Amino acid sequence: MIKISILCVGKLKEKYLAEGIKEYLKRLTPYAKVDISEVPDEPCPENAPMAIEEQVRQKEADKLAKKLRPGTFLVVLDLKGKMLSSEDMAGKIQDLALSGKSDLTFIIGGSIGLAPSLVERANLLLALSNLTFPHQLVRLLLMEQIYRWFKIIHNEPYHK
């Protein structure tokens, strides 16, 4: 069974998002073992100088990096990432599984993004959309997409 970890910066505060994520975790049970792990976001003053923002991003990246398992296929969500269709991403996951890579980690950065040191470690930079979303909403969007990918992989109705 495929193991998927979702690493996030910051605590999920909105109840409606938590309920949606919980629903997708339940739906994914037959397909993959999915766990979500949060690291605390670092305080960053509004309108902070670039150097301060870089320090904050690096501190968050260091916390995330400690949670990475050796050998995991690392997908970093990034606005500058590659845009793939749901079908293409499902195919990518299926290809990884067939080649023996059954451990995937997705990273969702905080409100000021991720440090380059972490982005550079990615096996895949993935953009879910050209639109900008709050990082907490991205968790729910990612969960829905992961569920959709597995429905596509198993040729089950849902994604049409």
Curated annotation (Swiss-Prot):
Keywords: Cytoplasm, Methyltransferase, rRNA processing, S-adenosyl-L-methionine, Transferase. It is found in: Cytoplasm. InterPro entries: Alpha/beta_knot_MTases, RlmH-like, tRNA_m1G_MTases_N. Specifically methylates the pseudouridine at position 1915 (m3Psi1915) in 23S rRNA. Homodimer. S-adenosyl-L-methionine binds at residues 77, 109, 128-133. This is Ribosomal RNA large subunit methyltransferase H. PANTHER family: METHYLTRANSFERASE (PTHR33603), RIBOSOMAL RNA LARGE SUBUNIT METHYLTRANSFERASE H (PTHR33603:SF1). It catalyses: pseudouridine(1915) in 23S rRNA + S-adenosyl-L-methionine = N(3)-methylpseudouridine(1915) in 23S rRNA + S-adenosyl-L-homocysteine + H(+). NCBIfam families: PRK00103.1-3, tRNA_RlmH_YbeA. It comes from the Bacteria. Belongs to the RNA methyltransferase RlmH family. GO terms for cellular component: cytoplasm. One of its GO terms (molecular function) is rRNA (pseudouridine-N3-)-methyltransferase activity. Its EC number is 2.1.1.177.
